[in-house]
Structure formats: structure tokens, C-alpha cells
Design a protein with these regions (language model features):
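Gly/Ser/Thr-rich helix-start
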Residues: 15, 29, 70, 103, ...
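Short, solvent-exposed loop/turn and secondary-structure capping segments
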Residues: 50, 67, 129-131
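Amphipathic alpha-helical segments typified by the pilin-like N-terminal helix
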Residues: 12-52
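Extracellular/periplasmic head regions of type IV pilus-like filament subunits
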Residues: 59-117, 158
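N-terminal membrane-insertion helices
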Residues: 50-61
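N-terminal leader/signal peptides at the extreme start of proteins
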Residues: 1-15
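Short, surface-exposed interaction loops/tails
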Residues: 2-4, 109-158
Length: 158
């Protein structure tokens, strides 16, 4: 009788190795499914934050043009520090130093000060094709020009 109660207590304690392996496998499968979706959601959030910052910079340039009757003239691939000297703090408190991926802005204006373009090279940080319109490429350049997006992320990103 004493042996029966000892054997029962030993079998009632804890999980078996097989049960633990099954649980670890299930957690691994869930993680494998969730991580790519989480990364995609984070990239989409960075795209939206970048677009919001581009609109804010564009608004500052519009306010600058109201006071000066022109956008800043002749900027070529300028970054945020060049623009900060022109628009902060009067038109914008601070110019974001770069896009949501920490890549620098590429800001251009024409020689007459009638057009501006703000470009983010996107997730990959490299200049890509600029076909215009919505694009499903997660690495696409985002281009904002004269208060409108010329190229932007749209739809399911790949």
C-alpha cells in the first residue's frame, strides 16, 4: 500500500517532457505567425508617421511662402538642418531630423521658388523608382510636393 501512494504522487506532479514539447511547439508556431504581421504593422506605422511629418514640413513651407511670396529658392537635396534655419521656430517649432526610419529628408526647391519636393527614401533608405501614385512596395520612396503626395504607400505592402 505504501508503494502505491508513492507511485501515485510521483505521477501526479508536474508536466511530462512530451507535454512541455507540445506547448513549446505551439508557442513557436504562434510566434512564427505573429512576428511577420507585427513587423508589417510597425512598418506601416512608420510610413504613416513619415507622411504626417512630411505634411507638417510642407505646411511650414507654405507659411514661409505666404510671408516671402516664394518657397526657399534653389535647395538641392537639402536636409533638415538647412530647412530648420529657414522655418524654425516661426513656421515650425522643430523640423524632424529625418523620416521614421531615421533616414535624412531630401528637400528640393526650384530656382524660382515656385515648387518644393520632400522625399523620404522609405524603409530601405535607397532612392527607388518614382512612378507616382500609390505603390504596394514597402521600400517605396514617399514623395510630397506642393501640398500633395506625388507617390505614397497604398494597399497591402509587400
Amino acid at each position: 500500500m505504501h508503494q502505491d501512494s508513492t507511485r501515485r504522487r510521483r505521477t501526479d506532479r508536474g508536466f511530462t517532457l512530451i507535454e512541455l514539447l507540445i506547448v513549446v511547439t505551439i508557442i513557436g508556431i504562434i510566434a512564427a505567425l505573429a512576428i511577420p504581421n507585427l513587423k508589417n504593422a510597425m512598418d506601416r506605422a512608420k510610413q504613416k508617421a513619415t507622411m504626417t511629418n512630411m505634411r507638417s514640413i510642407g505646411n511650414a513651407l507654405e507659411l514661409y511662402s505666404i510671408d516671402h511670396n516664394t518657397y526657399p529658392r534653389g535647395l538641392s537635396d537639402a536636409n533638415s538642418s538647412v530647412l530648420t534655419a529657414m522655418v524654425a521656430p516661426l513656421y515650425m517649432r522643430t523640423v524632424p531630423p529625418g523620416d521614421a526610419w531615421d533616414n535624412p529628408w531630401h528637400i528640393d526647391t526650384n530656382a524660382t521658388g515656385t515648387q518644393y519636393t520632400i522625399t523620404s527614401y522609405g524603409r530601405d533608405g535607397a532612392s527607388g523608382s518614382n512612378s507616382g501614385g500609390a505603390t504596394t512596395d514597402i521600400n517605396c520612396d514617399i514623395i510630397y510636393s506642393n501640398s500633395a503626395f506625388y507617390q505614397w504607400p497604398g494597399g497591402a505592402q509587400q
